Amino acid sequence: MALYEHVFLARQDLSAQQVDALVEQYKGVIESGGGKVGRIENWGVKSLAYRIKKNRKAYFTLMDLDAPAEAVKEMERQMGISEDILRFMTIRVEAHEEGPSAMLQRRDDRERGDRGDRGPRRDFDDRGPRRPREDDRPRRSREDEGDE
């Protein structure tokens, strides 16, 4: 049996339970064809680069498959018929990656905050602490410009 990575995009108006039901449905297709499903990663709702079937966002899901080609073809056939699936792509790989995918790692990186691993802003001793913005000198309004 060959190893595959399969990603599919489901419509944004589905609930999370409906997306999980789709995953279980296609997992059943693979298992009935004699294959196995490894990890399943739900990447959540993401914005699309362009509209697909009048949708600007979609649920992204990754599945690692160890299945014969016939089972994968049957799953792809059923996905092509389903109105809930916007796009899908299956890629044959030599080995499945260990640990979380690059998409999940990127999501974890964003949770660290704006400055990442650099920590909070520091005060530079030679300049002193930053002053609050409201202490700036008052700005001239447009009404003041005409008086001169």
From Swiss-Prot:
Concerning its family, UniProt says: Belongs to the bacterial ribosomal protein bS6 family.
Give a short account of what the protein does: Binds together with bS18 to 16S ribosomal RNA.
Alphabetically ordered keywords of this record: Ribonucleoprotein, Ribosomal protein, RNA-binding, rRNA-binding
One GO biological-process annotation of the entry reads: translation
Q: What is this protein called?
A: Small ribosomal subunit protein bS6
Q: Where is this region: Disordered?
A: 97-148
PANTHER family in the cross-refs: MITOCHONDRIAL 28S RIBOSOMAL PROTEIN S6 (PTHR21011), SMALL RIBOSOMAL SUBUNIT PROTEIN BS6M (PTHR21011:SF1)
What highest taxon heads this organism's lineage? Answer: Bacteria
Q: Which Pfam families match?
A: Ribosomal_S6 (PF01250)
Q: Which gene encodes it?
A: rpsF
The GO terms describing molecular function are:
small ribosomal subunit rRNA binding; structural constituent of ribosome
User: Known NCBIfam families for this protein?
Assistant: S6
